Design a protein with these regions (language model features):
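A structural signal for well-ordered alpha-helices, especially hydrophobic packing surfaces
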Residues: 37, 58, 62-63, 95, ...
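Juxtamembrane/interface alpha-helical elements of multi-pass membrane proteins
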Residues: 1-65
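Extracytoplasmic ligand-binding sensor domains of the Cache superfamily
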Residues: 54-82
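Short, non-transmembrane cytosolic segments of multipass membrane proteins
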Residues: 74-104
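Charged, amphipathic alpha-helical oligomerization/scaffolding segments
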Residues: 28, 35, 53, 90, ...
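Membrane-interface, cytosolic juxtamembrane amphipathic helix immediately N-terminal to a transmembrane helix
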Residues: 100-141
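Bilayer-spanning, highly hydrophobic alpha-helical transmembrane segments
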Residues: 2-11, 125-151
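Residue-level recognition of alpha-helical structural elements
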Residues: 22-25, 47, 69, 87, ...
């Protein structure tokens, strides 16, 4: 009986942490796109220069688990633990065309994808609070119902 309740609580904690990781990951990638835009706009840096100038903490917040910096941004996205597939699709689309056009066009593309990802971030964050409450309540309630039915 106690094991069922502990299992429900553990699953509840795991589900809530997953929702939090998803929201934090999307926020970190928004910050990454802001930095990319800033470095292209202000300093005219290439994608390789931008990648090597990124803060390790930002990469960890994005879910990067590698020891060495990847060679390009697509490799970075491939090695990150991204919990939100819509955000991953936006990022893959952006980085697949990044660095293949003139500076002015790159800035426009950065703004476009940053706007898309920011809208998605607001959606994910607004849903996160409700999902955390739902998962915390539902998992514990189901384990309690199971205990009542079994005993």
């Amino acid at each position: 009986m106690l094991l069922i309740l502990i299992g429900g609580a553990a699953f509840s904690i795991f589900a809530v942490q997953t929702v939090e990781k998803r929201a934090q990951s999307v926020k970190a990638f928004c910050e990454l796109l802001r930095l990319v835009k800033e470095r292209v706009e202000c300093f005219g840096m290439s994608s390789g220069q931008i990648l090597h100038s990124l803060d390790r903490e930002l990469l960890l917040a994005c879910g990067y688990r590698g020891d060495e910096l990847p060679n390009d941004f697509l490799e970075l996205i491939g090695e990150c633990d991204i919990y939100d597939q819509s955000a991953k699709a936006i990022l893959l689309e952006f980085f697949s065309e990044f660095g293949k056009s003139y500076r002015a066009e790159q800035i426009k593309r950065c703004e476009y994808y940053l706007d898309r990802l920011s809208k998605h971030e607001r959606l994910v964050c607004s849903r996160a609070a409700d999902q955390k409450k739902l998962y915390a309540t539902l998992c514990l309630s189901l384990s309690l119902v199971l205990v009542i039915l079994l005993f």
